[in-house]
Regions:
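Aromatic- and acidic-residue-enriched segments that line the glycan-binding/catalytic groove
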Residues: 52, 87-102, 157-171
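Active-site-flanking structural segment that lines cofactor/substrate pockets
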Residues: 37-38, 42-70
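A contiguous, low-structure linker/loop signature
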Residues: 80-121, 145
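Glycine-rich, N-terminal phosphate-binding loop and its surrounding beta-alpha-beta segment
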Residues: 62-92
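Short C-terminal domain-edge/linker segments immediately following a structured domain
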Residues: 59-66, 105-111, 178-182, 236-239
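Active-site loop segments of alpha/beta catalytic cores
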Residues: 2-35, 40, 49, 73, ...
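Pocket-flanking alpha-helical
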Residues: 42, 85-89, 138
Length: 267
């Protein structure tokens, strides 16, 4: 990506997508691929948590403040990381206005790779359907002006949510092959939700997969996730922004091999 005075003026959408494609831009885009939700913005547009996580109109209204109030070049309506897990059957702690919802990982739904099943109503569950509805609304209202970024959770994150963090990490130590099988099955939830968001109007997707430095090593990333992430980049045909929290220096070389458009290293 480079900025040049010779590049004609771009819309916010053109600017973000050109940057993700490593093409010249008229100026450096300002893009938040995770969430801009704050209590102040909720109050400003009357779209508070937890309702803004479950109502597509409120979700879209709050997300739009990224563009209308903050002047960013992107809108990202998925404020949490629970939608897929909720649709898969996990219990959710919805919290109040000043906190985001979380998965109750102490109450896992799966113990073995053979337990993994994607429900037939996965994409029509209220929490996944809400995201699709919000993206569709945003695309209709802002789609020509600003980049609409969705979010689909990676299989390692889904493993934490659906197996529990400690059981999933222990499984990776005790039975790496069964862990790979579990990841292979869970990735279908990632792909299905990602493709549905593209159909709804998403221009790019954030893909959080929390193989964080405090829990797994760079070699773990290479062993379990690099090739799987390469596959996701091939199967989901819009720019993907990988997110991993925390210190990730030891896996950057592997992440660079995936074909993802960008890497979001903390939030």
């Amino acid at each position: 990506m480079s900025s040049s005075q010779s590049v004609p003026a771009m819309s916010s959408r053109e600017r973000v997508l050109s940057a993700l494609a490593r093409k010249p831009v008229d100026r450096t885009p300002v893009c938040n691929p995770t969430s801009v939700a704050t209590v102040e913005l909720m109050d400003l547009v009357d779209a508070p948590f937890p309702e803004a996580n479950r109502n597509p109109e409120l979700m879209a209204r709050l997300a739009a403040t990224s563009y209308t109030e903050l002047g960013f070049d992107s809108i990202m309506p998925v404020f949490s990381i629970i939608q897929e897990s909720s649709a898969l059957g996990c219990s959710i702690q919805w919290e109040q206005k000043d906190n985001w919802p979380t998965v109750r990982m102490g109450d896992p739904i799966w113990e073995d790779a053979d337990d993994i099943k994607i429900p037939p109503d996965y994409l029509t569950h209220p929490d996944t359907k809400c995201v699709l509805g919000a993206i569709s609304r945003l695309k209709k209202e802002y789609g020509d002006e600003v980049a609409i970024i969705g979010k689909t959770m990676g299989p390692w994150s889904l493993g934490y949510h659906c197996f529990g963090v400690e059981p999933f990490l222990l499984l990776s130590l005790d039975d790496p092959e069964k862990t790979k099988l579990a990841l292979d099955r869970m990735k279908e939830a990632t792909v299905q939700f990602g493709l549905a968001q593209i159909e709804a109007g998403a221009d790019a997707l954030t893909l959080p997969d929390h193989a964080t430095g405090d829990l797994v090593s760079g070699e773990y990333y290479k062993r379990f996730l690099r090739d799987l992430h390469i596959e996701l980049a091939e199967r989901i045909p819009i720019p993907l922004i990988l997110h991993i929290c925390g210190r990730t220096v030891d896996r950057m070389d592997y992440i660079a091999q995936t074909g993802f458009a960008a890497f979001h290293f903390d939030s």
